[in-house]
A protein has these predicted regions:
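N-terminal helix-loop segment corresponding to the beta1-alpha1 unit
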Residues: 1-139, 143-148, 172
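Short amphipathic, helix-prone segments within low-complexity/disordered or flexible regions
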Residues: 144-149, 153-172
Length: 172
């Protein structure tokens, strides 16, 4: 028996920071169902990384833009313990699947949303992938690509490691 056996998680994530959290839950025994559109997760282009970040998960194709897809998702949410997404703020609400709709379907459901810039404020609607946040609001944004005139403010130099993506799961 594992420590999270019996826990059911719906995974609406892609790329790195999003899938890492549900991956850890699956590693600890939770049943994780990754929901993808018919086009699939764009991170599938990195096959080995995709397989690693999505190990231990079941996969289900749903078109959340249709009423049938939304109905199936809400039925799954009625029997789930958590939903994890890394969509831009407001995307699920526009689909009729925001936190209020999820809680109406299942009042004990935990909804975790991983965003690049939070849920409100001027940058909230923007997609954010590491190193986007560190290069827009940190000393990294002042680094240049080695130009002689360091005041030229050339394109930001991202950090070598994907620190934000790797650390996000510890906050979630």
């Amino acid at each position: 028996r594992t420590c999270l056996e019996g826990l059911r998680v719906l995974d609406l994530t892609s790329f790195i920071a999003g899938p890492f959290c549900p991956m850890l839950l699956a590693d600890l025994g939770a049943e994780v169902v990754k929901i993808e559109s018919a086009e699939g997760d764009p991170f599938r282009m990195a096959a080995f990384a995709f397989a690693g970040w999505n190990r231990g998960k079941r996969s289900l194709v749903l078109d959340l833009k249709t009423s049938a897809g939304r109905d199936v998702f809400l039925d799954l949410a009625r029997h789930a313990d958590a939903v994890v997404d890394n969509l831009r703020p407001g995307v699920l609400a526009r689909l009729g699947l925001g936190t209020e709709a999820l809680r109406a379907a299942n009042p004990r459901l935990v909804h975790t949303s991983i965003t690049g810039y939070g849920t409100d404020g001027p940058l909230a609607p923007l997609p954010g992938f590491d190193p986007s946040p560190p290069t827009t609001r940190s000393p990294t944004s002042y680094q240049t690509f080695g130009y002689a005139d360091s005041c030229s403010m050339a394109s930001p130099t991202p950090p070598g490691a994907s620190a934000v993506n790797a650390a996000t799961f510890s906050v979630v």
